[in-house]
UniProtKB/Swiss-Prot annotation:
Annotated positions for site Important for catalytic activity: 99
Function: Catalyzes xyloglucan endohydrolysis (XEH) and/or endotransglycosylation (XET). Cleaves and religates xyloglucan polymers, an essential constituent of the primary cell wall, and thereby participates in cell wall construction of growing tissues. Its induction in case of mechanical stress, suggests that it may contribute in the adaptive changes in morphogenesis by being recruited to alter tissues tensil strength, or flexibility, enabling adaptation to mechanically stressful environments.
Domain GH16: 22-211
Signal peptide annotation: 1-21
Catalytic EC class: transferase
Main location class: secreted
EC number from the UniProt entry: 2.4.1.207
Binding site for xyloglucan: 101, 114-116, 124-126, 190-191, 195, 272
Organism: Arabidopsis thaliana (Mouse-ear cress)
The protein's name in its UniProt record: Xyloglucan endotransglucosylase/hydrolase protein 22
Gene name per UniProt: XTH22
PROSITE patterns the UniProt entry points to: GH16_1 (PS01034), GH16_2 (PS51762)
UniProt subcellular location: Secreted, Cell wall; Secreted, Extracellular space, Apoplast
Length: 284
């Protein structure tokens, strides 16, 4: 089924503008001993994985709320055992984190897209999906929108998940710790594919994932201050991602994805929560 719906793009005057992406300016490769490379004058970045090591990079900026997008083309062919990630994370032992994780699979089998939200080091809010396209054939855009009211995960402009701020119910929500954007390609064949039953085929190495089109509309955190001083006050900025929510059309698209492509939802896993489902699940 063709996907024609795109979420509206909102601009704000008090955020960093989404100028043309340039990896040389916006990110730094943090590990991999040369396996991560910036190419084409900063327009393309590749990560590779072999038996010795994977690789990764991070944004130079920290954000306290933002809308971060990346075009990615995942490892083709037999990617079993590999994990490609795009996420926001704060440092420390009680960290906040918002995850996209792409779990590789055997040739011809679809990737699993794993999402999760951590607050103060506590996660357990997983939702997993199969994608409705081949994520290795072309670049596709993955976006995390994080504002004081909600977190929205989108794929090519189509929302797949919304995690609302339900602190009124006692549910933790990440809103106090600035986070960087991170991405990595690494070996996780002890769990990534069929619970670790399928191992990485190192004869296919090096495995490579490609990135372009990094966009950051965000409240940049620098020297203990935000570029959006009123961002934590809900509803103070209208007409931007800081107050963006899903309209009825977007909600319909999200329900279509969840109905047809969601393969795991912690909110329906009664065996995992014998004392009762999390409160935010009952309120949804």
């Amino acid at each position: 089924m063709a996907i024609t719906y795109l979420l509206p793009l909102f601009l704000s005057l008090i955020i960093t503008s989404s100028v043309s992406a340039n990896f040389q300016r916006d990110v730094e490769i943090t590990w991999g001993d040369g396996r991560g490379q910036i190419k084409n004058n900063g327009e393309l970045l590749t990560l590779s994985l072999d038996k010795s090591s994977g690789s990764g990079f991070q944004s130079k900026n920290e954000y306290l709320f933002g809308k971060v997008s990346m075009q990615m083309k995942l490892v083709p062919g037999n990617s079993a055992g590999t994990v490609t990630t795009l996420y926001l994370k704060s440092p420390g032992t009680t960290w906040d984190e918002i995850d996209f994780e792409f779990l590789g699979n055997s040739s011809g089998e679809p990737y699993t897209l794993h999402t999760n939200v951590y607050t103060q080091g506590k996660g357990d809010k997983e939702q997993q999906f199969k994608l409705w396209f081949d994520p290795t054939a072309n670049f596709h855009t993955y976006t995390i929108l994080w504002n004081p009211q909600r977190i929205i995960f989108t794929v090519d402009g189509t929302p797949i998940r919304e995690f609302k701020n339900m602190e009124s119910l006692g549910t933790l929500f990440p809103k106090n710790k600035p986070m960087r954007m991170y991405s990595s390609l690494w070996n996780a064949d002890d769990w990534a594919t069929r619970g670790g039953l399928v191992k990485t085929d190192w004869s296919k190495a090096p495995f490579t994932a490609s990135y372009r089109g990094f966009q950051q509309e965000a409240c940049v955190w620098s020297n203990g201050k935000s570029s959006c001083p009123n961002a934590s006050k809900q509803g103070t900025t209208t007409g931007s991602w800081l107050s963006q929510e899903l309209d009825s059309t977007a909600q319909q698209r999200m329900r279509w994805v969840q109905r047809n492509y969601m393969i795991y939802n912690y909110c329906t896993d009664a065996k995992r929560f014998p004392q009762g489902l999390p409160k935010e699940c009952l309120a949804a």
